[in-house]
Amino acid sequence: SGQKKLIVDEAIVPPRAVFDYAVTLGAPASLTADGALDGVSHSLEVLYSAVGKPFYAQMERVARESIRLVMQYLPKVLEDPADGTGREALGLATDLGAYAIMLGGTNGAHLTSFSLIDILSHGRACALMNPYYTVFFAPAVEGPLKLVGGIARELGYTHSDIDALGGRALGLAVAEALIAFIERAGLP
């Protein structure tokens, strides 16, 4: 049908997973970037949608690691594709992103990305849209934004005083940090 569909059912969830991140060493830069951007979008979007839900604390832990690993290692791996440590970090981050969507659903950026896949890859389309939804959702997701903004500040993507901001101003600061991350990775 040409339509992407998400099927989640206990019958198709394996009892164990095997991860061999070494297989990514030969992956082209575009595939590496798109996979990492999609994985970080999973974590970011589920984190936003988890506010007030029973699994929020668990999602916060998952998102903290997934987002930090992608923001820290994607630019490095794109500069040095043979960086095994970076590839392992990105593999773990995207696996955490996959785990995130088992906890809760994605939202605006993923939904909008499907309208853009004729001109952009899915991961890049999500990365393009996430800053906009970050600002849009900001008043309702201040806790997640402080988490993401803190990671961005720690990694040098923003100099804003994240803890002093709230509402739209916080959303704008985090959105600008997300854009700075994409730019540092050399992606449009």
What do the PLM-derived regions correspond to, one by one?
Residues 33-96, 100:
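C-terminal and late-domain segments of enzyme folds
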Residues 4-5, 9, 29-37, 56-64, ...:
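Amphipathic, non-membrane alpha-helical segments in soluble helical-bundle scaffolds
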Residues 123-188:
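Gly/Pro-rich interdomain helix-loop hinge
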Residues 37, 67, 109, 126-127, ...:
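A general structural signal for well-ordered alpha-helical segments in protein cores
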Residues 41, 51-55, 113-117, 128-141:
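Glycine-rich flexible loops
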Residues 95-126:
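Glycine-rich phosphate/pyrophosphate-binding beta-alpha loops
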Residues 1-54, 146, 150:
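A glycine/threonine-rich phosphate-anchoring loop and its flanking beta-alpha core
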